[in-house]
């Protein structure tokens, strides 16, 4: 695959052993690897060791444990270390920009907290609403991925956030109905890996820590959280298990994370789902062996919010930070906090494991230069009022919580460029670009116009009202404004002062639709398909899409227009592919554009393409099938294991999406990587040159023993709440309420024999064998050796400036062929 400003790189397609029916269990792997300093991590590691060496046990625990849901300004914060002047680290959503104000995992959060005292503001706080990750994938541009990441990083830094909860590379998009596919970078692991690496570099260049998520095999919303599924009427007690074979894990789901680690990502978020029947944040195989062992990840693993299911077990399994800190939202009870303090004091967890957690957190902090660019936290996730409660959950600490700092700078230009360059021209019978001087232009469809209640009126964008510019869920942000296609197109035409333009912005108003479209020289018809996170249901779509059809009767609206207008231009806003089979080859549809989820600059970016101000250069980041069955994969829609964890077998192995279409010889409507242009390109002088790649050498040897940075007291009395200290209600602290550890822990099972819950070798801090697949951050260096250089002379033969994205698909000869 080629990225616009880079040499050609080949995408290898290989067959692998598919998963088969069996009992799926995740193999244990202990101890949790301790980090070390090397390469670009060396200086940060040394600073981290120096800092952590000064800490008491309770201060180390404070670094690892969130203070509780809605207890501070950010969606997640750990404790502070006042003695050293170290403020609480701020974790903030999300992958499209700074999310706050509506903070609305409402369905599940209100259910769990019984808290109805939420204020739902509808305004943005001087931040940019960027295009979605799937749009970045459609640009195939490392440059734009970097620029978007850097702009985001600058905004988070300006608001005082330390960690961006993004970018997303899980879900990768195994099933086209997946609710959060749009947050990620598409279903090809090479494309996703290259672009996530540049996004991370941009974010961290700005002085904030990127958090790549969701690790791993997190491919659907349904059943991801048992309590959430219960709210939808499913009687299950455990989250879904994604059952994945090792080849598929490495070649598909782990690959983009390898690129993220190689790029120096500071944090990775573990996921809600189980992997081979072990929860993501307590899975020692995926966290200890794959991520910290094979990939050599030097940063810290953070739990998704309430994806933390155990205390001692998750610590041994590699989790480094618990978010938001409480076991259930608003309880003030934590698996860690005081319980982690007790577990170290009584010898259950060796102190070196907590040292390693703290060093990993601080190494990421120093690596991106957080100590050099500190900005006070100047926003609040729970209200956009200037004044409010610092501890919103319990309504304590009233004062100024929002300073309304404008952090946007020139970022609207970057957002517009990404939205524009990600627009994919799927069909053109010579009608595009338009001139703006057409005699009569009709604009048809709700998706062209505004949400009459405002673009932020639905919490976390949990509706499909007006034009679709982002999906829904925690990965959203508030729009500072939203330029609708209707506004931008009308402005373009009226500015020319020649043609008429008329809009009908109700999909079902067939009488007026036909009356207007029947007079038009060109009818611009807008359709969409939305999706999002599982805590919000929109029209029965509980995060994941129910189907791949258009929403709000879009197909029928297209039929109504094309029956009276022979020059219909179709514009699609969607979170993924839709079924285009019934209209893509309609002769009265003269052009089709996919604009994805373009963010705040939606209309402006579209006008740039429609009216030829810029050449369309986007390439489809997914395959467009003729039927849902063409994909060969879908989400699991019904429980299949009684009340236990639904079992989702990834039986296709690596053969999903375009690989499946190729293997099964299924002709799609539009291929992965497809996209037309207003100009033409010719290829010549194609050359393939073998590179002098180094021989693959498995890593060998032993690690050093686990660094021990402190010898803390084992006396429980040393960890009691400080005398005279007045705490915040339901706040998670590292201190004990009693010298009786069972009473202080609140754990009815306290005192169980260690052999009943501490896995063999988990507390072994001796030198350990180096994994053969390891070597440097990202994995064995042999993974990144260039085998061939492919070059060509590409000539623009047309009369317009444009960009081309050459693509090369190579079937490796030592695997069974999958292409005929």
UniProtKB/Swiss-Prot annotation:
Residue positions of the active site: 304
EC number: 3.2.1.21
Subcellular location field: Secreted
One Pfam family cited in the UniProt record for this chain: Glyco_hydro_3_C
Enzyme class: hydrolase
Residues in the signal sequence: 1-18
Name of protein: Probable beta-glucosidase ARB_05654
């Amino acid at each position: 695959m080629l990225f616009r400003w880079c040499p050609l790189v080949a995408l290898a397609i290989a067959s692998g052993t598919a998963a088969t029916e069996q009992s799926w269990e995740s193999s244990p792997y202990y101890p949790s690897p301790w980090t070390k300093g090397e390469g670009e991590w060396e200086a940060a590691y040394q600073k981290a060791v120096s800092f952590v060496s000064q800490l008491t046990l309770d201060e180390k625990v404070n670094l690892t444990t969130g203070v509780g849901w809605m207890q501070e300004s950010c969606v997640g914060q750990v404790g502070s270390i006042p003695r050293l002047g170290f403020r609480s680290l701020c974790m903030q959503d999300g992958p499209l920009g700074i999310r706050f104000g509506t903070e609305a995992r409402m369905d599940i959060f209100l259910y769990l907290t019984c808290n109805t005292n939420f204020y739902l503001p509808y305004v943005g706080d001087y931040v940019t609403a960027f295009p979605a990750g799937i749009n970045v994938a459609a640009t195939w541009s490392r440059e734009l991925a970097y620029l978007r990441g850097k702009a985001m990083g600058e905004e988070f830094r300006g608001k005082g956030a330390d960690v961006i909860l993004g970018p997303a590379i899980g879900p990768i998009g195994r099933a086209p109905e997946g609710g959060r596919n749009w947050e990620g970078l598409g279903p090809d692991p090479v494309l996703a890996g290259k672009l996530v690496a540049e996004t991370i570099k941009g974010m961290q260049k700005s002085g904030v820590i990127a958090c790549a998520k969701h690790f791993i095999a997190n491919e659907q919303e349904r059943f991801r959280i048992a309590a959430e599924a219960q709210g939808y009427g499913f009687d299950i007690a455990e989250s879904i298990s994604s059952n994945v074979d090792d080849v598929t894990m490495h070649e598909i789901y782990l690959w983009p994370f390898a690129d993220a680690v190689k790029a120096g990502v500071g944090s990775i978020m573990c996921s809600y789902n189980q992997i081979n029947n072990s929860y993501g944040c307590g899975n020692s195989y995926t966290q200890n062996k794959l991520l910290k062992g094979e990939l050599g990840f030097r940063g810290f693993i953070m739990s998704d919010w309430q994806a933390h299911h155990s205390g001692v077990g998750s610590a041994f399994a590699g989790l480094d930070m618990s978010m938001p800190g409480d076991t259930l939202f608003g309880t003030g009870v934590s698996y860690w906090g005081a319980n982690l303090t007790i577990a170290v004091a009584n010898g259950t967890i060796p102190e070196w494991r907590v040292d390693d957690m703290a060093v990993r957190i601080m190494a990421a902090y120093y690596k991106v230069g957080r100590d050099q660019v500190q900005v006070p936290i100047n926003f609040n996730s729970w209200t956009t009022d200037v004044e409010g409660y610092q501890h919103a959950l319990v309504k304590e600490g009233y004062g100024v919580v929002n300073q309304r700092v404008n952090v946007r700078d020139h970022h609207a230009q970057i957002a517009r460029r990404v939205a524009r360059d990600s627009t994919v021209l799927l069909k053109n019978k010579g009608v595009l670009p338009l001139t703006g001087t057409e005699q009569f232009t009709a604009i048809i469809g709700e998706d062209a116009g505004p949400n009459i209640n405002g673009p932020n009126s639905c919490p976390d964008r949990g509706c499909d009202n007006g034009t679709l510019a982002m999906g829904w869920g925690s990965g959203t942000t508030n729009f500072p404004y939203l330029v609708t296609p209707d506004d931008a197109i009308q402005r373009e035409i009226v500015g020319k002062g020649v043609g008429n333009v008329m809009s009908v912005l109700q999909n079902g108003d067939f009488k007026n639709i036909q009356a207007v479209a029947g007079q038009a020289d060109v009818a611009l018809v807008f359709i969409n398909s939305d999706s999002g996170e599982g805590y919000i249901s929109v029209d029965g779509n509980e995060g994941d899409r129910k189907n791949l059809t258009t929403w709000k009767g879009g197909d029928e609206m297209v039929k109504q227009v094309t029956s009276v207008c022979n020059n219909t231009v179709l514009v699609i806003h969607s979170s993924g592919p839709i079924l285009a089979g019934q209209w893509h080859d309609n002769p009265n549809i003269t052009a089709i554009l996919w604009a994805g989820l373009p963010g705040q600059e939606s209309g402006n970016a579209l006008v740039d393409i429609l009216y030829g101000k810029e050449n369309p250069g986007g390439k489809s980041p997914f395959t467009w099938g003729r039927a849902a069955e063409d994909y060969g994969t879908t989400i699991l829609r019904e429980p299949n294991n009684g009340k236990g964890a639904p079992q989702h077998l990834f039986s296709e192995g690596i053969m999903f999406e375009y690989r499946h279409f190729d293997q099964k010889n299924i002709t799609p409507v539009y291929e992965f990587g497809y996209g037309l242009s207003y100009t033409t390109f010719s290829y010549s002088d194609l050359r393939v040159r073998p590179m002098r790649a180094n021989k693959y050498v498995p890593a060998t040897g032993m690690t050093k023993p686990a660094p021990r940075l402190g010898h803390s007291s084992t006396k429980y009395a040393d960890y009691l709440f400080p005398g005279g200290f007045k705490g915040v209600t339901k706040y998670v602290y590292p201190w004990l309420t009693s010298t009786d550890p069972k009473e202080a822990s609140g754990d009815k099972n306290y005192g169980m024999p260690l052999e009943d819950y501490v896995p063999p070798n988990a507390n072994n801090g001796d030198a350990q064998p180096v994994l053969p697949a390891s070597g440097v951050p990202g994995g064995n260096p042999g993974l990144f050796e260039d085998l061939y250089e492919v070059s060509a002379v590409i000539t623009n033969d047309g009369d317009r400036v444009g960009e081309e994205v050459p693509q090369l698909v190579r079937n490796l000869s030592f695997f069974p062929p999958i292409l005929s």
